[in-house]
Design a protein with these regions (language model features):
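Structural motif
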Residues: 50-52, 98, 120-124
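Solvent-exposed alpha-helices and their adjacent loops that cap or buttress functional pockets
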Residues: 44-47, 115-117, 147
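A glycine-rich helix N-cap at a beta->alpha junction
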Residues: 24-30, 114-137
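Extracytoplasmic/periplasmic beta-strand context in beta-sandwich domains
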Residues: 1-2, 123
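Small-aliphatic-rich amphipathic alpha-helix that forms the alpha element of a beta-alpha
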Residues: 53, 59-112
Length: 157
């Protein structure tokens, strides 16, 4: 995994512009009440987060000497997601919030940050102290989606 601390204001502005385009496209895929609700969702982490991290998977890493990547190359990306989850949990223990911005064009993010071609974009994280604390997910709280029970995801065989 590769973490890029995006601190340069010009690069942040480029990421923000990328988000604006992708967000407008996403809004265009909604209609009626769903579009109104989408437009009200809190998507301002790119403007307020003091720390912004772009996270990539190095698809040509020499680390591990390719062990397991011939049969399951996707585990490189899964390892990155595991690192993100570990960072997220550690941050939360300190009262720090993490937001995953997924409304971005991955190719444009990689280009804006001038990373090697072998780096696959996985996540853009906004990190900072939250303005307010909640125990329920924001998308549930705002009516975007109902909470789904664990039984929907766990199968017994």
């Amino acid at each position: 995994w590769r973490f890029v601390n995006v601190s340069d204001p010009n690069r942040r502005a480029t990421i923000r512009a990328n988000f604006e385009i992708a967000n407008a496209d996403a809004l265009g895929n909604c209609s009626g009440e769903r579009a109104k609700l989408y437009a009200t969702l809190k998507l301002d982490g790119l403007d307020k987060a003091p720390v912004q991290l772009a996270v990539f998977s190095d698809t040509q890493t020499p680390q591990g000497h390719g062990l397991g990547s011939q049969t399951m190359p996707e585990t490189l990306a899964y390892s990155v997601v595991g690192a993100i989850q570990t960072l997220w949990l550690a941050a939360r223990t300190q009262g720090i919030g993490v937001g995953w911005v997924s409304i971005l064009d991955p190719t444009n993010v990689a280009r804006a940050l001038d990373v090697p071609d072998a780096w696959q974009f996985i996540a853009y994280l906004c990190v900072g102290y939250p303005e307010e604390e909640h125990t329920d997910p924001e998308l549930v709280r705002h009516g975007w989606q109902d909470r789904v029970g664990l039984s929907e995801f766990i199968l017994e065989r």
